[in-house]
Structure formats: C-alpha cells, structure tokens
C-alpha cells in the first residue's frame, strides 16, 4: 500500500482518479505481481518451461507496443497469434487487464485506508484480516431472538456488460480508463463465458478472475446501497457499521468494546449496540435480510427489492430468487453453521401461603450449532469413518511416518475446533474429535500390523497427546485473561479473525 501512495501523492490533485497513464508504467505490473493478490494464477508468469518467473521482458514489449500509434487496438479479424509478442491474443489482453485491475483498485484501497484511519484513530489493520467472511461474525453476534422472518436473497447477476462499466463511473472519473474497460469487456470477453450461474453462487472463468471479481464486487456494492439507506433510515442512532466497504472492518470495533465493558467487571448483560430494524449480511453469492416485521411486511419488502433492482439496474430478476422463511420454524445453513431460534422452557415453582404454583416460561435463544450430519459426511468422504460415523483407518496414509500421521489428524481436528469455536454448543465437536482420534489410532495400528489395543499399550497414551490440547489452553494463547467475567465470555464463543475459509477434509490424499 505504501508503494501506491508514493505514486499517487496529494500534490497531484489535478490528476485525482486519473488512472489511465499508470497502465504504461512497468512498476504497476511489478506491484500487481509482488502483492500476491493473484500470485498463484498471475498471467504475468512465464510458461512452465521458464520456471514460473515474472516475465518483465513481455511486459516491456507490451508497453512499447501500447505506446505505438494505432497499434494498441487489435482487430477481431487478427489472427490468434501475435507475432510481436509471440503469444496469443488472449494472453495479450489478460496482461493488460491484470495491470488494469490493480490500477482501478487504487481509489478503493485509498478509500479503505481513509475509512480505517478515521474509524480507529490512524490505526491501520493488516489487509489479510479484512476479508469479507468477517462480516458473518458480528452478524451472528446480533440479537436474533426478537426477529420473526428472514429473506433469503440470491443476488442477481448483470445481464449486460455496460452495467459493470456504469457502476464504476461514480468511483473512477477517468473517461479513458472507462473506455479501456469497455474495450476489454466487449472485444475480448463473452458474458456467457465470464459468469456462470449453474451453482447457487457465481463462478468466473479461470482467465483473470481477479479482474472480474473486482467488477462483480463493485456491482454488488451498488446493489447493497439500498440496504445501507434503509438501515440508516430505520435506526434511531446513525449506524457506523455500514460505511465504505461495508461488511469488512467492524468486527474489530465490536470486540474492543466488548473487552472494554467486561474488563470493568460488569455482571449484567448490557445492550452495547442499538436494536436495528434490519440485519443484513452477504455470503457466497447470497444475502440474508432478517427483520422483526410481519409476513405481510416482508412480502412487501420482497416485491420492492425486485422492482427496484429491475428498474434501477436493469436486471433479469424474479420473485422466485427471494424466499421468506419464518425464523422460529427454519434452521439456517449459514457458513457451515446451523443457526436457529429456539424456545428454552424453564419451570419455576412459586408458593404463596398454602398454595403453590408452577410457572412455565419460554425464552427465545439464538443458537449457532455445529452441523453433525454434514461433518460426518465429509469425514466419510475422506475415509475417516463410515456414513454412520464409525471410525475406520485411512490406508493411504499408512506409508507415512507416525509423526506425520498424527500431525495430519491433529491438524484437521484443530482446524475444526478453530472454525467452530463460535458455536454455542460444542458437544458435537467432541464427537468429531473422538472419531478422528480413533481413526488415527486404527491407521497407526494398521501400519504396525497390530490391533488398536495392542498398539496403544505398547506405545503409550502419550502418542496421541496431539488431540488432548484443551480449548482453554488454545484460548489463553489468543486472549489475555483480563477478568473472570471476560474469561467466561471467551470460553463460551470465540470468533477467530484468521479464518477465511474451511477446506475440504479430503485435501490430504
């Protein structure tokens, strides 16, 4: 980020958002490669025969070609082979578009720095902790017990490429850059090959995914502007959780305020945050809108959103992409968690003189549970257990050393505990831990051609101490024990900021 600021100094005010000249600079392509945002799939890499090194020679020739008059535009009638570069036209376009993707991200990056500085008093957070998945943590921490209905929205995709260009007009005021963007989209790409909607979310072609993910995220940000306006209008206090680049940075402020309050040894639950009218979050091409309104009100919201997106964004959108579910009757499959609102019954005996009464109270509680059936299915797919959850050995790992086998099983177990540490009930995790531990023992016994009992008796129980690390010891390495009440909060539910995905359990083959 420092490199970007060095090339965009404030004294160049006349060139604010004037990004087109940067595409002729070699350092832009070096920064796009060195920042590692697309390190594993960078099109600026040589062919496999050249040891995957950055080809500055191709970049140099490309920039020289762009400087030449009337040679930048490539006619669609040209052959696929470009004699000057020695590569096909698709690679020629991808090289420019990757550098262009890095350039158009500059205004957003500077805006993010400005937003973070004003929010936390000039404190800049590391970019790897600003992933979109972190929006799910404060979303699950919100009070859902009073909410009634949830709208499941499948985010529409643009039906015309010009919509993507128009979305950036408010951010990039450089007409030349917008014309270049329009040239890429209309000359080199076909919408049917860019976006495929066979799955619930969206997937892009493997060619230069970073460029099109940036365009898609910018487009989705504009769609979400509706919820930002409605949220601010419906709240008594001005919301600070829907600023620039919403759903990214505000978990920090929330956890710091929790620490600040509980460190003072308050023994009561405080409503630290206002009770909003709507709760909104987006994930995997979907979005969820929870509200405490009636079914009639949610149905009006549904048709309002459909009409708004159709008229304002010219989207091919129909009501079947929005489903209304009652929160108390449906469990939400949300980012690997099974979330639901259930009633906790409690019975109180009260006695007045000679008469006694039984009072039944039902309190709503929002639970984030570990889905046991999908997890056992993943373990069965990875040959750790049967479909019924009975542990079995993993023969493909029997050729490894004992330490490698234990390390692999232990890594899977730690990752699962790490990811599902925010669950309100961890009983399921200990069942998964038992399956992995016994599967590890059977794999080791298979390797040494003995039974599990004989192997453990000969090797000792210390061999599997990898699975005996208590949750409290892991948490003590992450959070200081500021007070007893604060430690009680940490023991119940913890959200780790270094999580950005959960990998398939069958990765190790």
Swiss-Prot record:
Family named by the database record: Belongs to the intron maturase 2 family. MatK subfamily.
TM ranges: none
GO biological process: one example: mRNA processing
Organism per entry: Nicotiana acuminata
Locations listed in the record: Plastid, Chloroplast
Protein role: Usually encoded in the trnK tRNA gene intron. Probably assists in splicing its own and other chloroplast group II introns.
GO CC terms of this entry: chloroplast
Gene (name only): matK
Main location (coarse class): plastid
Name by which UniProt lists this protein: Maturase K
Keywords: Chloroplast, mRNA processing, Plastid, RNA-binding, tRNA processing
Domain of life (superkingdom): Eukaryota
GO molecular function: RNA binding
